[in-house]
Amino acid sequence: MRTDLFMNQEDQLNQEILNYFERMKFSGVAHYFCCWSYGWARIFHQMDRWTGITTTTVSPIIQMILRCYLLIFTKDEILIKRVKLFGKESLPAHSDNKHLVRLSRKDIQSLQVKPIKSRFIGEGGYEIMIQADKKYYFEIHNLTDNSFSAVQFKQMLRQGYFE
């Protein structure tokens, strides 16, 4: 069961995202959700997932490298924005264009969503790969809760958005 504190933080993040859309004057925002990326440490994460060893010294190091991203899907482009996890604001106004990648739909060569097979009991989540000039990998988990990210992502899956 989620606590009120977590729900308030989530509501605050969702409001910050909506304010960000307004500041950036995005039009036609269809879907958005927050997800995780391992960046250059992805290979260690993959080895950890394949072996099922989550108690090694590598896992805590990878978790420190883990970054949260906001994926925004408009009719013309996909935007990838890094979200701060610590501090007063997750999307401060002074850094609207910082850590923002804009990918035109015509430049995207591939968009794949694959279920993550978990070796343990519980939901594994999904891996998202976007290939344009380079490949971007993300993961989304905890799809059983009613967070805005879980709701948006499940809606996109139901609509066949990634097919």
Regions found by a protein language model. Name each.
Residues 17, 21, 112-115, 157-161:
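Hydrophobic, Leu/Ile/Phe/Ala-enriched alpha-helical segments that form helix-helix packing faces
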